[in-house]
From Swiss-Prot:
<dbReference type="GO" id="GO:0005634">
    <property type="term" value="C:nucleus"/>
</dbReference>
<feature type="binding site">
    <location>
        <position position="653"/>
    </location>
    <ligand>
        <name>Zn(2+)</name>
    </ligand>
</feature>
<dbReference type="InterPro" id="IPR003340">
    <property type="entry name" value="B3_DNA-bd"/>
</dbReference>
<dbReference type="GO" id="GO:0003677">
    <property type="term" value="F:DNA binding"/>
</dbReference>
<keyword id="KW-0804">Transcription</keyword>
<dbReference type="InterPro" id="IPR015300">
    <property type="entry name" value="DNA-bd_pseudobarrel_sf"/>
</dbReference>
<keyword id="KW-0238">DNA-binding</keyword>
<feature type="binding site">
    <location>
        <position position="632"/>
    </location>
    <ligand>
        <name>Zn(2+)</name>
    </ligand>
</feature>
<keyword id="KW-0862">Zinc</keyword>
<keyword id="KW-0479">Metal-binding</keyword>
<feature type="region of interest" description="Disordered">
    <location>
        <begin position="218"/>
        <end position="240"/>
    </location>
</feature>
<feature type="compositionally biased region" description="Basic and acidic residues">
    <location>
        <begin position="221"/>
        <end position="231"/>
    </location>
</feature>
<feature type="region of interest" description="Disordered">
    <location>
        <begin position="777"/>
        <end position="820"/>
    </location>
</feature>
<dbReference type="GO" id="GO:0008270">
    <property type="term" value="F:zinc ion binding"/>
</dbReference>
<feature type="compositionally biased region" description="Basic and acidic residues">
    <location>
        <begin position="782"/>
        <end position="803"/>
    </location>
</feature>
<feature type="region of interest" description="Disordered">
    <location>
        <begin position="881"/>
        <end position="949"/>
    </location>
</feature>
<protein>
    <recommendedName>
        <fullName>B3 domain-containing protein Os07g0679700</fullName>
    </recommendedName>
</protein>
Length: 949
């Protein structure tokens, strides 16, 4: 351990500062620590002492230790001395393509002050863009640029890209009478250089066409310096400044005349380097900053004069529909762009006729199915109705007279419906007008106003395939927040797909001295309305305001793609349905199936995966034998094979090892051309029926109407006249694709199409039969359960009443012998009058009466009789008092045990007060005796009280 510590101490002692001018040893623990220096070629970093490392971190290492060494150069922009031949200063400067050097401070300043331009055309590589001012040394030193480095191509008006001596420039032909925004370098008395921007007057003439659209940027014009010497102007050259062409699609005050203007601008400054108007540009930006800002250049378009009109577009775009902003009205700013009128000048002229009146387009609406139907009601957009139609306060509305394009007046009822705290405005009675104009769903109705007079006019436009500008882009154009690159890409794309002008852009490219984007630098005067590009940004506004919002809102994402509808039978034949694919899946030859029963269906299960077989046609002979027919891949002849043979996906006649006569392609075909035609035709008909209706048939069930009936045709004659029945078009419910085989799609409409055979075995019929069978079984089961429940209830009542009745009739009772002669009779209640007795059996009563027996009385009837008032009992029996019965009964002595007499049915004696018939039953003697024996004192008191009453 002592040896290792000594070695470590020796290593630390040998470690010194790598600065040759310093060479300090390892610092003491209290003196400081080592610092990292420049990266070494062998890896790692140089080891410096605290003093040298601090100088290296502050970028003054060479200024302190290498002042007398060679390799020093000045920064091309700030003039700082840089030690270019030292590894310690390797990361403190950068080399310019033109041969100069640039310090790291200038690099950082340029990165902070430069504003990224997302719409800069990718004309040059990033390396060239960063070194755009290749001759910055000449600019700073005051030497003019050599004219030999600018090569102007005078053969066309387009810009020519020059890259000479690693100096890319964009130069356009400068002709007589044409001026440009130039960058002038002027020398002051102290020898310093200033860069001033001037905005000379642009003359009207043949202007060069700029093939690029630039982003929106505000135009600022700086004043001339009064202290400048006009005689010190140096040679002028074309500047590479940022410029902009503010464009907006709009309509002028006169409604038709449009103009194109462009604004020449100076380089855009970051918010931190902005300066007020009149301040010298060099006080805010250094010469290096000017050079760095120039790499974010945008080509400056020329100003188009009043006489410069782009004539070819008149012929190329005669039917371009551009949405016009709506006229003045209540709430016009709330109108959606889809309601803006896209009416052309020709249509306006047709409406106005030869009169001097002015037609003001208001809005338009695409007719829906309900609008064009027989309801006679046209739903109006709420904002449009409130803005341009007369105000109404009652739901009944008011009559409204509107003139059509032919001059005929129509009378409608303009009203509204309250709807969720809002209103839905409608025009009622529009059916005659729509029928007269022969309008359908999808057509467009336009509403305009005739000035003076304010009369409403209704025009129309038939539905076509014309593609208009998207609503999002129209709204962005109207709001004025539009970018050049977005408009260039999206509008060009829309113009290229205008109906009837698909080759519009290609024709412009092929025209002489024209560029693709030149249509944006000139008027587009068409019959649909003039199109112009107007500047929208105000003086001094920031160019990036609202750009991000517009990029999100105005991005052209194309029209909404909808699901492709394939209704044609030819298109259906291109698809392989799942049942057709299953025909190609066959079990492996060595696989043995396991049969499983699921819902009365036998399903074969295999442990091995299926194999792909060749498509074949299965037939049934007149004898009942089944065959399959395979087509050879070489000779295209059809060969007969047994049903159980599995054919590979690629099969030839040489693979036929079963039939030796057909094992060669030279062997004749077994089918005649007529039979083959019948087989193939019926096979296609079967496939079409199966695809349309989900028709499924098992192979053993195919008959003469099936796809392969040539054997039957040979026995019964020609079956060519046996055409398949016509198949009606199915009514598919929504969200189901063509070829759907659900139970709704495969059935024909109600009352249409062929009827199914009662013995049909299709999927629908089998499903219906299975469901009907299940329903009938459930119905019978419920009925039997109900009958069993009723029978069990009856048996329970009978078992409960039977011991009670038998005890009354069979049990011996102790009776008083003195009352044998007096038998109290109760009326039997007629249970068929007003009540339903569940224990009443008419058949049993008839049987008892037939055999001389007496019917049995239930406990319910006895309880009802016992609950009757005593007065009714006395009236029914003709008794006025119970004293006589009581006295006579008292003379009888002794008691005897006698059987209870049976209950007998008595005749109807009296009727109650309300006229109802009442039947009575004779009371058993035991009950009377029981009451007399058990409660004799109480009954005597009760009888005496009744007698007194």
């Amino acid at each position: 351990m002592a040896g290792m510590a000594a070695a470590a101490a020796a290593l630390v002692a040998a470690k010194r500062c790598m600065n040759a001018a310093c060479g300090a040893p390892a610092p003491s623990p209290a003196g400081g620590e080592w610092r990292k220096g420049w990266p070494l070629r062998s890896g790692g970093f140089a080891v410096l002492c605290d003093k040298c490392g601090l100088a290296y971190e502050q970028l003054v290492f060479c200024d302190i230790f290498h002042q007398k060494e060679s390799g020093w150069r000045d920064c091309s922009f700030c003039g700082k001395r840089l030690h270019c031949g030292c590894i310690a200063s390797k990361n403190s400067f950068d080399l310019l393509d033109s041969g100069g050097v640039q310090c790291v401070t200038c690099i950082k300043n340029s990165a902070v002050q430069s504003v990224p331009s997302p719409v800069v055309p990718k004309l040059f590589s990033s390396q060239n863009n960063q070194r755009l001012f290749g001759k910055s040394d000449d600019l700073l030193s005051g030497r003019p640029l050599e004219t030999s480095s600018l090569m102007v191509d005078a053969r066309n008006d387009d810009l020519t890209i020059i890259a000479k001596n690693n100096l890319p420039f964009m130069v356009k032909n400068v002709e007589a009478g044409q001026s440009s925004n130039i960058l002038r370098q002027k020398e002051l008395e102290n020898g310093a250089r200033q860069i001033k921007w001037e905005l000379p007057t642009l003359s009207i003439g043949d202007m060069g066409r700029i093939p690029f659209l630039t982003r929106s940027q505000s135009a600022l014009e700086s004043r001339r310096d009064e202290n400048k010497d006009p005689t010190t102007e140096s040679t002028t050259s074309e500047s590479l400044s940022e410029a902009c062409l503010n464009m907006s699609l709009g309509i002028a005050s006169n409604g038709n005349k449009l103009e194109a203007t462009s604004t020449v601008e100076r380089p855009m400054l970051s918010p931190t380097t902005g300066f007020p108007e009149g301040r010298e540009l060099t006080t805010a930006l250094s010469p290096f900053q000017h050079a760095q800002r120039a790499r974010h250049f945008l080509t400056r378009p020329p100003r188009v004069g009043e006489g410069a009109v782009f004539d070819p577009t008149k012929d190329m775009l005669p039917h371009l529909r551009v949405a016009r902003p709506p006229a003045e009205g209540r709430g016009r700013n709330q109108l959606l762009p889809r309601y803006w009128p896209r009416i052309t000048d020709q249509e306006l002229q047709q409406i106005s006729g030869d009169s001097n009146s002015t037609i003001v387009p208001l809005f338009e609406k695409v007719l829906s199915a309900s609008d064009a139907g027989r309801i006679g009601r046209l739903v109006l957009p709420k904002a449009c109705a409130e803005a341009y139609f007369p105000p109404i306060s009652q739901p009944e509305g008011r009559p409204l007279t509107i003139q059509d394009a032919k001059g005929k007046e129509w009378h409608f009822q303009f009203r509204f419906w309250p709807n969720n705290n809002s209103r839905m405005y409608v025009l009622e009675g529009v059916t005659p007008c729509i029928q007269s104009l022969q309008l359908q769903a999808g057509d467009t109705v336009t509403f305009s106003r005739i000035e003076p007079g304010g009369k409403l006019v209704m025009g129309f436009r038939k539905a076509t395939n014309t593609v208009s500008l998207p609503d999002s882009q129209i709204s962005a154009i109207a709001n004025g927040s539009i970018l050049g690159d977005t408009l260039f890409s999206s509008t060009n794309e829309n113009l290229a797909i205008v109906s009837g002008y698909s080759g519009f852009l290609q024709s412009i490219k092929g025209a002489a001295d024209l560029h693709t984007s030149s249509i944006y630098d000139h008027h587009v005067n068409s019959a649909d309305g003039d199109v112009s590009w107007l500047k929208t940004d105000k003086f001094g506004s920031r160019p990036d305001e609202g750009s991000l919002q517009f990029l999100k809102r105005g991005r052209n994402i194309g029209s909404k793609s909808r699901r492709l509808s394939m209704d044609a039978e030819e298109a259906w034949e291109l698809k392989l349905y799942w049942d057709e694919v299953q025909e190609l899946l066959r079990p492996a030859p060595t696989a043995k199936p396991t049969v499983v029963m699921i819902e009365d269906y036998e399903i074969e299960e295999y442990d091995e995966p299926p194999v792909f077989a060749k498509r074949s046609i299965f037939t049934i002979r007149s004898t009942g034998e089944q065959d399959q027919w395979i087509q050879c891949d070489d000779c295209s002849k059809w060969r007969r094979l047994p049903l159980n043979v599995i054919v590979a996906s690629k099969w030839t006649c040489a693979d036929n090892t079963i039939d030796s006569k057909s094992c060669s392609c030279s062997a004749p075909e077994e089918l005649t051309p007529k039979e083959l035609h019948i087989v193939l035709q019926q096979y296609e008909d079967m496939r079409r029926r199966r695809n349309s209706f989900g028709f499924k048939q098992n192979i053993p069930e195919m008959d003469a109407v099936s796809l392969d009936a040539f054997a039957t045709a040979a026995v019964y004659g020609d079956v060519g006249n046996q055409g398949s029945p016509s198949v009606a078009t199915t009514t598919k419910h929504p969200r189901h694709r063509p070829g759907c085989t659900c139970i709704v799609c495969i059935q024909p409409p109600s009352g249409k199409g062929p009827k199914h055979n009662p013995a049909c075995t299709c999927n629908v019929c089998m499903t219906v039969r299975r469901r009907f069978k299940t329903l009938m079984m459930r119905k019978k089961q419920r009925q039997s359960e109900r009958e069993e429940a009723e029978a069990s209830k009856k048996i329970a009542w009978m078992n409960r009443d039977e011991p009670e009745g038998s005890s009354l009739s069979r049990s011996p009772q102790t009776v008083d012998t003195t009352r044998d002669g007096d038998v109290t009779m109760f009326d039997k209640v007629d249970i068929n009058k007003g009540h339903i007795d569940l224990n009443f059996h008419p058949t049993a009563v008839r049987d008892e009466e037939r055999h001389g027996g007496q019917p049995r009385v239930s406990m319910v009837s006895l309880l009802e009789v016992a609950n009757r008032p005593l007065e009714n009992y006395m009236k029914q029996n003709g008794l006025t008092s119970l004293a006589g019965e009581q006295g006579s009964s008292s003379t009888c002595t002794g008691a005897a045990t006698v059987p209870q007499p049976a209950l007998v049915e008595s005749e109807e004696r009296t009727s109650n007060n309300d006229g109802g018939r009442v039947a009575t039953a004779e009371q058993p003697e035991s009950m009377a005796v029981d009451e007399a024996g058990d409660n004799q004192p109480d009954k005597a008191a009760g009888d005496s009280a009744a007698a007194l009453a």
